[in-house]
From Swiss-Prot:
Organism: Oryza sativa subsp. japonica
Name of the protein this chain belongs to: Ras-related protein RIC1
Keyword terms, alphabetized: Cell membrane, GTP-binding, Lipoprotein, Membrane, Nucleotide-binding, Prenylation, Protein transport, Transport
Task of the protein: Possesses GTPase activity.
Membrane topology: Lipid-anchor
Biological processes per GO annotation: protein transport; vesicle-mediated transport
Lipidation residue positions, type S-geranylgeranyl cysteine: C200, C201
Top-rank taxon: Eukaryota
Subcellular location: Cell membrane
Primary subcellular site in the record, as a coarse category: membrane
One GO MF term attached to the UniProt entry: GTP binding
Cross-referenced CDD domains: Rab1_Ypt1
Length: 202
């Protein structure tokens, strides 16, 4: 395995357009924030390496466009994802109502045991809030996935959201019995072959 890291996890950010997916990614990867952000066209990604429990984890985080017209492009990125973060905007009821639709997309395109996390973003805009913390938590509990509220603007829980996801995936990987597959699948990244665990075959 590449000595630079112990794990390579591919994460996907999904949710309606305008909920702040790109801002969350920018805050986590670069610790920066932009008041106005151009809508993502198709997909974009950033990489950040983190330490957790003495292990080095390389996170390849893909930011997807929320618009319907890009859905066919973005759906192909679900398949190789180890973890998917579903984001809604606490000041936008419709984005919360659409969470179940996004979860259906995961069921349709992602691998069966992919880790999921529900995130309510823009919690700094308290005066504009229309979705309560309790409503978000109740939905996450119903689905059986972790839940956090975040603010990309003031960095609330952004680090925690991505680290929670990394920890959940790492624990799942550690608890999986060793398969008798001859070799793990390999993806080529920047000229370096990277071992990638394959959890389903077509």
């Amino acid at each position: 395995m590449n000595p630079e890291y112990d794990y390579l996890f591919k994460l996907l950010l999904i949710g309606d357009s305008g909920v702040g997916k790109s801002c969350l990614l920018l805050r986590f990867a670069d610790d920066s924030y932009l008041e106005s952000y151009i809508s993502t066209i198709g997909v974009d990604f950033k990489i950040r390496t983190v330490e957790q429990d003495g292990k080095t984890i390389k996170l390849q985080i893909w930011d997807t466009a929320g618009q319907e017209r890009f859905r066919t492009i973005t759906s192909s990125y679900y398949r190789g994802a180890h973890g998917i973060i579903v984001v809604y905007d606490v000041t936008d009821q419709e984005s919360f109502n659409n969470v179940k639709q996004w979860l259906n997309e995961i069921d349709r395109y992602a691998s069966e045991n992919v880790n999921k996390l529900l995130v309510g973003n823009k919690c700094d805009l308290a005066e504009n809030r229309v979705v309560s913390y309790e409503a978000g938590k109740a939905l996450a509990d119903e689905i059986g996935i972790p839940f956090l509220e975040t603010s990309a603007k003031d960095a609330t829980n952004v680090e925690k959201a991505f680290m929670t996801m990394a920890g959940e995936i790492k624990n799942r990987m550690a608890s999986q019995p060793a398969t008798n597959a001859s070799k793990p699948a390999t993806v080529q990244m920047r000229g370096q072959p990277v071992a990638q665990q394959s959890s389903c075959c077509s």
